[in-house]
Amino acid sequence: MASSPDPPSPLLVRLRESIPKAHRKLEIYFQSRASGGGECSVQPVGPSAPDTYEVKFLKKADKEKVLKKSEHEMLVHNKPVTIVLETTKKPVEDLRPRLPSLTQPVETPSSRPPSLTGSLDEALCDDIHPQDGLVSNSVDSVVQKIFLAVTAELNCDLLSKEQRASITTVCPHIIKSMEGSDGIKKVCGNFKDIEKIHHFLSEQLLEREQKRKGSEQKRKCAPQKHTPPDVEREPPDQSSIQVPVLLLEYFKHVNPGRLEFIEYKFGVNIEIQASSPNMVTVGFTSSPFGNVEEASQSFVRDFQKCSQSLKQDCISLEEHQRAKEVRQELSRCFPKLLIKGQGRTLTLLGSPADISAATEKVSQGLGLRPVKITASGYTTGIEVDSTRFKLLEPELLQEISEIEQKFNTRGKVQEKGQKTCILFVPKDKDLDLSVQSYTGFTDAFQRATWQLRTEVLSLKGLGKERARLHNTKFADNFKKEHPNVHFVTSQESVTLTGLPHHLAQAMQYVSKRMGLAPSSGEKLAMDQETPMEISSSDPHGDQQENAALPAPRGTSSSPAASKGTEDYCVICMDTISNKHVLPKCKHEFCTSCISKAMLIKPVCPVCLTSYGIQKGNQPEGTMSYSTQKGSLPGYEGCGTIVINYEIKDGIQTKEHPNPGKAYHGTRRTAYLPDNTEGRKVLDLLHEAFKHRLTFTIGYSRATGVSDVITWNDIHHKTSKFGGPANFGYPDPDYLKRVKEELKAKGIE
């Protein structure tokens, strides 16, 4: 009679470290000649014994040959992994993992078996001694008295929402201490209820694992004895996706840690390998309890959402160091922009709005490089007449304060005898705008000088009062009361010079004490016999070394002095020659002075009234516009005007910096709200483009490249979003500012 086949002979083995698909790799190893084994199957023991596996040999002799070999190890990714054999002391009839009990007595170091086999035998064997049951029952009763209530936090990553919801069916009176949109997270109850829930959920997990193992067994192909023993088989439970390397870098840049989260959530390992010069393969390999299909689907959804509507652009700079500086600045301003550097070239990848704002920021150079302006002509400051400065001091000090705030400088006023020096020092060493400060002060000084007025009080008919007027005490008191009014006396009159509001107070002071009345309706002239001079040492203007003050524009004078009337030009700071009166504002200048000034800028130097539209040197190009239904931030309720500028490549002419040299064209896009004010600004911008004022050819401070198309001091919104820092909206004052910029060029 034929003998029955041997029952499967099990062997417990343990790995020193966790590896993916370990049971498949062990199965291959124990069927190879290197192990001495033969036909077998391998299954993990379960959660109670991590990294421990049951090897069932079809032949007991194969198991014996494996046990005779003292050391076992296999290669995983060219790395040796040690396999430890656990020899059992008694036959293992049922290797299914027991459900762990919360009331099981805690094992102490003294009672722990000397090897892992003993503990596994106790955990896996169904034979329990009667005395163990008595101990367990006694412990249950004691524990029940010790713990009045127990709170347990559920593993939401391991248990589905439906499995956690079924808890209320098992224990209806359990308390759900924490429940959110994704289900129950914490439960509270007595010790027995918590233990009951623990057993129930453990059974659910074991059933799911057994179903998965059963489906794997069905997918097995030919008998394993026909498989070449020394060849490691590729695990079938894996997936791979090929994507562009640059898009994957962008995905990891804007979603840091997302790949690690997918690995943790779905129990997979993700490996990235280059497959071609511009492509990479994202591989998904499942762990014992992982789900490759759901992991790959989750990655595809996230990747497509992240990479849609992306735009790529390149920026070339003049030197490698400059490229590094620009890259750091753009990375700070646009955190969701991927910036790749190669030499002097930067590659930008991101949303169209970020790309547009970044390229605009580079082209305008705002915040990217310290602006260095040489103030060689102002190293010692500006010197003005001390006496004149005293007359204008209140207004000039206020102007200096505003200039300090506007240009981030610190003004210093130093009196040096007959001259007063005004010096501006930058507060920020990297941004020197002292030249602009000096220009602003010069304009303010000229405007204030134009406001100076002179009043002449006649002394005819006075007796004793005239002697009192020439008294030193009177002059000292006058200077103390009115330090910003110049006071000069002669035998026939008293001359007062100052700003209108200071002058009115001084005249009241003199009239009250001397009983005088000012002459009216006539301009003051310089007295031919006694020139009006302002002395820094003589309070009466006597025959001492004086600093001459050019005659200011007067409101009244004596008849005797009217013949010598000479007006004052604020441009050359001298007496007007060949007078020219501007038609709109009626300000007067030397003809030669105002002609030169109008060639530079057709506005009045005093009040900035426009006298014509400026002409620019913008190259040939086109300007067009269209409208969109979408609104801009801050202008909800109206559409959007889209302006498109195009300047083609060309050759510079004599009105450009380098005639005969080529320049590259450009395309720019700007946005305005489609409302009444926006359409008005559109008309003004169109007028500026017609007069060639929108663009110019010059040096770009941002890129360091010469002979390029740049904006010409008329600001445009080149992005819909991002605010003023990114040349976008919302910016409630933009339309007002751009109209002022256009007005300064004569367009209004």
Curated annotation (Swiss-Prot):
Membrane topology per record: Peripheral membrane protein
Modification after translation (UniProt): Autoubiquitinated.
Gene Ontology cellular component list: cytoplasm; cytosol; early endosome membrane; lysosomal membrane; nucleoplasm; nucleus; protein-containing complex
UniProt zinc finger (RING-type) residues: 569-608
Catalytic reactions on record: S-ubiquitinyl-[E2 ubiquitin-conjugating enzyme]-L-cysteine + [acceptor protein]-L-lysine = [E2 ubiquitin-conjugating enzyme]-L-cysteine + N(6)-ubiquitinyl-[acceptor protein]-L-lysine
Basic and acidic residues biased stretches: 209-219, 227-236
Record protein name field: E3 ubiquitin-protein ligase DTX3L
Native species: Mus musculus (Mouse)
